[in-house]
Amino acid sequence: MDRKLDEFIGDATPKKVSKEKPVRRKKRLKPTSLDSFLPEEHINYFRDLRIGSKKIRNAKIEEL
């Protein structure tokens, strides 16, 4: 541990500059409408309750 700071910096490898393609980001999912998944009865039921789609997703649907 008698090394000086300059010796540590000198041993470091320089960053490589790559000319490869940039990393592609994951595509985001398009927002979907719950109308295409739920029956009309359930859609009307939740609209009457005036609750958001997150609560609709987590709700347990019981017999009307």
Curated annotation (Swiss-Prot):
Its job: Binds to the DNA polymerase sliding clamp (PCNA) and dissociates the PCNA trimeric ring, leading to the inhibition of PCNA-dependent activities. In vitro, inhibits the PCNA-dependent activities of DNA polymerase PolB and of flap endonuclease 1 (FEN-1).
Subunit composition and interactions: Interacts with PCNA via a non-canonical PIP (PCNA-interacting peptide) motif. Can bind both Pcn1 and Pcn2.
InterPro entries: PCNA-interact_regulator
Short sequence motif named PIP motif, residue ranges: 31-38
Protein name per Swiss-Prot or TrEMBL: PCNA-inhibitor
